[in-house]
Amino acid sequence: MGKWFTKGRIALLVIFGVLIADQLIKVAVKTNMYWHQSENVFKWLYDKLGIDATPPTWFYIYFTENNGMAFGLEIIDKLFLTTFRIVAVCAIGWFLYKFVKKGMKTGFIVCISMILAGALGNIIDCVFYGVLFNESTYSQIATFLPEGGGYAPWLYGRVVDMFYFPIIDTHWPEWMPFVAGERFIF
């Protein structure tokens, strides 16, 4: 590595690069799609490029918003959850700093930097999106800085989720209790 591309600078480039891309994609999805609207990325790309073929079906932009923790769970108060996220990002940042100072492998630093950037992006969603956007619904696309104000106060916004990879698309076995024969997508 050259003098300019130190591990610390690489970490910062990854964090800011991922964070900027994350927020640009989230704002584009939020201001151009209805809630739970889904678009096959390859179909869209094939249409734009004029490719006459059946596109793969394993990568979608599926607009949803997450009220709570992973999988949309809402076990604890939203304010506590947002505060916890901020504390967790500070801890990840501190560990990243220590890893850089210890001279850990660049690949490891990049991975931790991407995790940190994703967590920061979710904090931005929680802190600002409730104030900056109105409600996204099945019949209304959100607008930036609506006249009547946003859908939630500071720290109470929802995390925008949009990447969907239905890699496994099958049916449960007939012998499986409660879900026998039902479709299973993961």
Q: Where do the language-model regions lie?
A:
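Alpha-helical transmembrane bundles and membrane-interface segments of multipass inner-membrane proteins
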Residues: 1-186
